[in-house]
Amino acid sequence: KLHPADQADAISDRPLQEQTDMLPTLSVDNAADVLEHLDEDEAAEIAAKLPLETLASLLDEMEPDEAADILLDLYEGRALAVMEKMVSTDNVRPLLEHEDDTAGGRMTTQVPILHRKMTASHAITYLRNSKPDSENHYYLYVVDKDRKLLGIVGLRELITAKPSVSVEVIMNSDVIRASVDDDQEECAKLMSHYNLMNLPIVNQINQLVGVITYDDLVEVIEDEATEDIYALANLSADSDLDVFSPVS
């Protein structure tokens, strides 16, 4: 079975009508994965052509941030019509309030959180029962009763801690974070500089509202790295540079 990324590559070579016809022939979860792996503009074109019910079922399966990106690319009337047919939009609606190129527009609201008074044993049981998305499992976020971000705990530290120790004892309170209104490039710079796989996003009063994963910003991070390389060579990113040209 082809990986969704490979399926996306195969579909992207087809005319738009064929793409629109092919996607619904896949299982819903598979089609949602393929749509996530397509170029954003291409995914938007397909989404604009799919039947409302089909698109709604795919968006229900997708990560909230990916679903929000597609909805923002649709004209408002179609986006509202699709959302009416979705099973739930609770995790998607907050993301639609932010510009696509900001932290709020890039983040996912599905965040594994722990309350500071939890014991390690209680926290592990809670995670086992809630089954949060594995995409966000690099770190768990510790909050107070008002959901204000206090610290982070690595899954390894949690598992190896004494069962009776409280989460606030083993958490790291020195947390790199970004504001919901920060530009995506600033977030990419933070993640690249500190070698982060996840970046917690907070609002103006330090409440945890979401998290950005490396995958969410990989293209932005790569673009930043390319710009740095060109800057070192005193070239613009639009320069016509042929690295294989002979030295005169």
Predicted regions located by residue number:
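Hydrophobic packing positions in regular secondary-structure scaffolds
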Residues: K1-L235
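Cytosolic juxtamembrane amphipathic/interface segments immediately preceding
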Residues: S236-S248
